[in-house]
Regions:
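Short, acidic/polar
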Residues: 72-80, 131-141
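N-terminal metal-binding scaffold of metallo-dependent hydrolase/deaminase domains
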Residues: 1-41, 52
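Divalent metal-coordination and catalytic microenvironments
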Residues: 7, 28, 51, 62, ...
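Active-site anion/phosphate-binding pocket segments in diverse small-molecule metabolic enzymes
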Residues: 304-311
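Catalytic pocket of metal/acid-base enzymes, prominently hydrolases
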Residues: 52, 77-91, 108-120, 162-197, ...
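Histidine/acidic residue-rich metal-binding segments in metalloenzymes
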Residues: 137-302
Length: 312
């Protein structure tokens, strides 16, 4: 059986965490992880992976495979295949499909369609019927079908709906996702409000477009109880509000995207459309705060926010 030697195993809690390891592979499946020892045997198919690290499979809590609705952009089968090649063990596809995932049969369908894939699905159901933000979906039936979380893949605009959702889902133990963005605060904004947006002559989105919504949602959580997840946080001020809420004992978790950890609004110079995001890249100070939060426990997840488009 061939061995693949990695510079280190990254798996906190494992006795070999941080140490060089040999990965034993049989029939294209990992069957063992042992301390790196002795010379590798090229005739057996052994390979030295150099500086590569070995990780347990990653989980991506926000990706859109455009299935059903616009499968031409990717589709579930292709998306899960590529996710496996990228090292992801689990993916949570967003519920904003067409039709949206607001019925138990749709949860059962995605579980059935994905069960033969190496990468598994973490089913997310729509929070409101038709994602219209008016009436809650049948949460109990959806949870029984396999839904693990509930999200409209959008901000929950109506405070009363978020309150009822947190109260009801608190009894089920399922988290409610609410996007940290107030679309009515600066509806014309298309990038972070700052020096870069001024130089480029583009309308900005201030940090308040995020922090006003985070503080409102935390106030509702404080009143209603339940579990709140904020999928993408982009600002230092928003992170601080969540950090304070966690210290207070509120059941809130949050994430950010890999894009927000890597780039800033200054990288849009030259009008780079590839970095124009609906939740915009922020300042260098915000990026530093996000990186710090990834290590101090404030951030609970880093997501791909993978959303393929057709050429049209």
């Amino acid at each position: 059986m061939p061995r693949y030697r990695a510079a280190a195993l990254i798996l906190p809690g494992h006795p070999l965490h941080g140490h060089p390891v040999d990965l034993i592979v049989e029939d294209d499946r990992l069957t063992g992880v042992v301390p790196a020892d002795g010379a590798l045997d090229a005739a057996r198919g052994d390979r030295d992976l150099g500086s590569a690290r070995a990780f347990a499979g990653w989980w991506d809590l926000q990706a859109d495979f455009r299935d059903p609705g616009t499968e031409r952009a990717e589709g579930l089968n292709h998306g899960l295949t590529v996710a496996a090649q990228g090292g992801f063990a689990k993916v949570a596809p967003v519920a904003s499909t067409r039709p949206c995932r607001d019925q138990p049969a749709e949860i059962q369908a995605i579980l059935h369609r994905s069960h033969r894939h190496v990468t598994g699905v973490l089913p997310v159901a729509a929070l409101s019927a038709g994602r219209a933000g008016k009436e809650l979906t049948e949460a109990h039936a959806l949870a029984e079908a396999g839904a693990l979380a509930f999200s409209d893949d959008a901000p929950v605009d109506r405070p009363e709906l978020l309150r009822r959702a947190l109260e009801y889902h608190g009894g089920l133990g399922t988290p409610v996702f609410s996007e940290a963005h107030d679309p009515k605060f600066q509806p014309e904004g298309i990038m972070h409000e700052g020096a870069a947006s001024t130089r480029m002559g583009l309308p900005g989105l201030s940090e308040e477009s995020e922090t006003l919504r985070i503080r409102r949602d935390l106030d509702i959580l404080r009143y209603s109880g339940g579990r709140l997840h904020i999928p993408v946080v982009t600002t230092a001020a928003g992170l601080q509000s969540i950090r304070d809420a966690k210290a207070e004992g509120l059941s809130v978790t949050c994430g950010t995207t890999v894009h927000h950890l890597c780039w800033t609004d200054e990288d849009l110079a030259g009008f780079n459309r590839d970095l124009k995001l609906s939740l915009p890249l922020r300042s260098a100070d915000d990026r530093t705060a996000l990186r710090t939060a990834a290590f101090d426990g404030t951030l609970d997840a880093v997501v791909s926010d993978h959303r393929p488009r057709t050429p049209e």
